[in-house]
């Protein structure tokens, strides 16, 4: 699904943190954000994910305008360089953690944990701890 930013601007107290103009990123295209510290790379990602609201402009995924949608309705996730896995917990426990916090029933937690582990191809690693995984495996667990 194509990501399209149209005249996206974010101001903080009159200072422009982001002023993208308009551009799009095609589905499946690997894209990097490069620039010096403080140039707005993280702010742009926060805008796309819905963690910040733009001052002006629009954000589209495919034909869908997601500018006003809350983060949980956008279907977008971020995976940071520090994957924030709990080192004392197994892969299964890390994947299940959000569901446990929402007090979902045990059967649903087990089902969703297996489903997500299979989706990101870590089902053989469920009993391991993050320190026993490669960086790529840790990233896939964080995505799950």
PLM-predicted stretches and their roles:
Residues 1-144:
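ABC family nucleotide-binding domain
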